[in-house]
Regions:
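Conserved kinase catalytic-core segment
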Residues: 93-159
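AlphaC helix of the protein kinase catalytic domain
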Residues: 85-94
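Active-site catalytic-loop/activation-segment of kinase and kinase-like phosphoryl-transfer enzymes
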Residues: 83-86, 152-156, 164
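Conserved ATP-binding subdomain of kinase catalytic cores across diverse folds
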Residues: 1-86
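General N-terminal targeting signals
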Residues: 59-60, 91, 159-161
Length: 171
């Protein structure tokens, strides 16, 4: 709500230097001391394509994103989910035929959203699968987690996750 009343109850639990990706972010764990809930944020150097990608994701996808830009620093909220490469290797083989059909439909939607936003390089390690448990089934949503490859290429295949060999099992 914008109020600063909760700030005294927030602690920085840990700060990790992450060696993955091209941004090499710091991962900061913030914990609420009243209820022990925590959240992760990534602090990285801001650049125009990353901010552009985050803005488009926030406006054009069904997922809201929390991020803050101050001068040349970008703070992004962690996007929870199962990394795509882990999901393909460990979870996809165990899915039922109905679940696989639903995952394929979700991947088609994800593929089109990436194309519309010119979000490239959506290899399996650049998106997460979010399982949503319903009464009698699990629904799988796909969310991008890397937003820095915006509008660089003239080849449209770059913006279609279906064309990356890592994603063939999802297709």
């Amino acid at each position: 709500d914008g109020s600063a009343m909760t700030i005294p109850y927030l602690n920085v639990d840990c700060i990790d230097y992450c060696t993955f990706g091209n941004s090499k972010p710091f991962r900061v764990k913030i914990r609420n001391t009243l209820n022990d809930n925590f959240i992760y944020f990534y602090v990285k150097k801001a650049d125009a394509s990353r901010i552009y990608g985050l803005e488009l994701e926030h406006m054009l996808s069904p997922n809201n994103l929390n991020f803050l830009v101050y001068q040349n620093t970008l703070v992004e909220e962690h996007i929870a989910g199962i990394p795509g490469d882990e999901f393909i290797q460990d979870f996809l083989p165990k899915c039922s035929k109905t679940e696989r059909n639903q995952i394929a439909k979700s991947f088609v939607k994800f593929n089109e959203r990436c194309m519309i936003r010119l979000l490239g390089d959506m290899r399996a390690y650049n998106y997460v699968i979010v399982p949503i448990h319903d009464f009698d089934k699990v629904i799988y949503k796909i969310r991008a987690i890397d937003f820095d490859q915006q509008s660089y290429e003239g080849d449209l295949k770059v913006y279609r996750p279906q064309f990356f060999k890592e994603n063939i099992p999802m297709v």
